[in-house]
Amino acid sequence: MALGNEINITNKLKRQEIFADIKHEKNKERHTMRRKRAKEERENPELREQRLKENVTQTIENTRVYDETINKEVEGDEDDLMRYFNSNSNEPPKIFLTTNVNAKKSAYEFANILIEILPNVTFVKRKFGYKLKEISDICIKRNFTDIVIINEDKKKVTGLTFIHLPEGPTFYFKLSSFVEVKKIVGHGRPTSHIPELILNNFQTRLGQTVGRLFQSILPQNPDIEGRQVITLHNQRDYIFFRRHRYVFKDNERVGLQELGPQFTLKLKRLQRGIKEETEWEHKPEMDKEKKKFYL
């Protein structure tokens, strides 16, 4: 039964009956087609393989539009952070951790979490009268490699600022979806072992720079016997932080125990040097193109 002038039928019951018949006929045709296709594929398995190969669901990820400013010829070029890895220095990173001015309790609680996650951290409460440039100069003289600033607003941690010393760059991330350790069901207790680092899906030149940032604040010699791993998974320019421990159940099976916490980072700004020239900044109009990602 074809769909013609049935929509103009004024009798509601009659109209519903006709639409039900049309729907039933379409379902009948679909089931007949599926039975016929299944019979053909049983006789020739190659037809099924070809159908599954061609039947690829379109997602935002596989229809991604790459940033036209990324040139493949320069995608592997060095950035400011690459010099850190080329310096052949075996010294572990030394991190100076602080907060914004007049921070509240939530910022200090999050600082305790970062002290547990990042090795070789020195935390200092932020005082009035010290500008960021002055703090950076003091940290450089004391051989700190990075500054991490916890940004808090209205008693809530809203972002993280990373400054690589001595010449930058500076990263500002918005922080969201924070879940405390105690709210994670079945969480474990972390140990003092240096964790492994897994970076996933950082594909563009900007994404590689962000990945090198996280590589530079964690030592390159993890304690394998600790079985702890930090995962930073980039999906649609949102960076998901997770921390787990491998749990060996027997000689063949292995599981994961989450250690926590959970939070999400989104890059908002990348600046050269110590908060100098803006190299990249996220703008609201960038969110209009849902298939275009920058990391």
UniProtKB/Swiss-Prot annotation:
Q: Where is the composition biased (Basic and acidic residues)?
A: 38-47
Q: What is its main location?
A: nucleus
| SMART domains assigned | Brix (SM00879)
Under what name is this protein listed?
Answer: Ribosome production factor 1
Q: Keywords, A to Z?
A: Nucleus, Ribosome biogenesis, RNA-binding, rRNA processing, rRNA-binding
What is the role of the protein in this entry? Essential protein. Required for biogenesis of the 60S ribosomal subunit.
Q: Name one GO biological process term.
A: maturation of 5.8S rRNA
The residues covered by the Brix domain are: 93-276
Question: Which domain of life, per UniProt?
Answer: Eukaryota
Q: Which organism is it from?
A: Saccharomyces cerevisiae (strain ATCC 204508 / S288c)
Q: Which GO terms describe its molecular function?
A: rRNA primary transcript binding
Q: Which GO terms describe its cellular component?
A: nucleolus; preribosome, large subunit precursor
Misc. remarks from the entry: Present with 784 molecules/cell in log phase SD medium.
Chain segments carrying region Disordered: 24-47
Q: Where is this region: RNA-binding?
A: 254-271
